[in-house]
């Protein structure tokens, strides 16, 4: 039985929408109107892209967030948020104010950083996430892959 049919209060799944299976169950049980995608909790950008596509196909509203953030996390949030149709995007969370250190800078002055205008954020057009990590802040890598 659908929880949505028992109340007129809109339901958004947040912490429970943490995998492809959870999102599929949410939709199959008609349990909510939307999902809050948390990139680090959901396994990174690739799983979140799949979950985004599943939710968009079902007409669910989406927010893109993370549990806590940094400049690097926010770059991923902003880029994923831009891939959601405006009529389904509830919000993205600017996680940069959650930490007191700066972990990255804009990759290119010409391509810009994250611009805010009329309640929307536009991600950089520079390659990748459009940022240059501050390695002096991050320190040496724990592991590298080639």
Where are the predicted features?
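Shared catalytic-loop signature of beta/alpha-barrel
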Residues: 1-10, 17-120, 124
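Extended hydrophobic packing segments that form well-structured cores
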Residues: 129-146
């Amino acid at each position: 039985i659908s929880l949505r049919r028992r109340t007129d209060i809109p339901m958004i799944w947040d912490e429970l929408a943490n995998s492809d299976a959870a999102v599929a169950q949410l939709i199959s049980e008609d349990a909510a109107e939307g999902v809050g995608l948390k990139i680090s909790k959901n396994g990174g950008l690739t799983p979140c892209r799949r979950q985004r596509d599943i939710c968009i196909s079902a007409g669910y509203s989406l927010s893109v967030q993370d549990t806590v953030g940094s400049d690097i996390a926010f770059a991923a949030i902003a880029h994923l948020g831009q891939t959601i149709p405006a009529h389904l995007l509830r919000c993205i969370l600017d996680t940069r104010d959650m930490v007191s250190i700066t972990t990255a800078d804009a990759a290119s002055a010409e391509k810009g950083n994250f611009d805010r205008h009329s309640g929307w954020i536009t991600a950089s057009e520079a390659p990748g996430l459009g940022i240059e990590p501050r390695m002096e802040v991050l320190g040496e890598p724990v592991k590298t892959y080639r």
